[in-house]
Amino acid sequence: MMNRIVIYTDGGCRCNTGIGGWGVWLKYGDYDKKLKGNEKKTTNNRMELTATIKALEEIKSNQIGIDLFTDSKYVITGINEWMKNWKVKNWETSKKRPVKNVDLWQRLDVLNKQHDVIWYWVKSHSNNKGNDIADELANLAMDKISLS
């Protein structure tokens, strides 16, 4: 059986300042890659979504399955439950309001269709090595922008 790519993502925001960061740890066999980035005016949910988008954009082949782990219930519930209805309702919520972060959700939708992704929720700060690494990368990205 072919190994699957394992991805851990995390996003965060120091919302009193609006500074946000995201982190990604990709692992495939002995290969691993770490990615991180930041934005000056953002939200926690946008950073969580951005982390998953950046991770999936990094995967060039659609021939290998992906196990994607995130501590964001917003991302997990959105991708597994809400998105189907949003698309039927032309990206409106059940209360007929525009979906927040629709630009990112639409990008994630395209990427999710291009890959065989199994989505997993992992509890944050629970000594999960992959989640801890992604969290550390997101915080390093926020620290970098805080110091500049």
Swiss-Prot record:
Q: Which reaction does it catalyse?
A: Endonucleolytic cleavage to 5'-phosphomonoester
| Gene Ontology cellular-component annotations | cytoplasm
Q: Which UniProt keywords apply?
A: Cytoplasm, Endonuclease, Hydrolase, Magnesium, Metal-binding, Nuclease
- This protein's record includes keyword Metal-binding: yes
Localization recorded for this chain is:
Cytoplasm
Q: Name one GO molecular function term.
A: magnesium ion binding
Q: Transmembrane region positions?
A: none
- GO biological process terms held by the UniProt record: DNA replication, removal of RNA primer
| Cofactor(s) recorded in Swiss-Prot or TrEMBL | Mg(2+)
Extract the Gene3D superfamilies matched here: Ribonuclease H-like superfamily/Ribonuclease H
Enzyme class label: hydrolase
So where does Mg(2+) 1 get bound?
A: D10, E48, D71
Q: Which segments constitute the RNase H type-1 domain?
A: 1-143
Which EC number(s) does UniProt give? 3.1.26.4
CDD domains in alphabetical order: RNase_HI_prokaryote_like (cd09278)
Statement: the UniProt record of this protein carries the keyword rRNA-binding:
no
Record text on cofactor binding: Binds 1 Mg(2+) ion per subunit. May bind a second metal ion at a regulatory site, or after substrate binding.
**Which InterPro entries does this UniProt record tie to the protein?**
RNase_H, RNaseH-like_sf, RNaseH_domain, RNaseH_sf, RNaseHI
Annotated PANTHER family = RIBONUCLEASE H1
* Alphabetized HAMAP family for the sequence: RNase_H
Q: What does this protein do?
A: Endonuclease that specifically degrades the RNA of RNA-DNA hybrids.
**Family affiliation:** Belongs to the RNase H family.
Q: What is this protein called?
A: Ribonuclease H
Q: Organism, per UniProt?
A: Vesicomyosocius okutanii subsp. Calyptogena okutanii (strain HA)
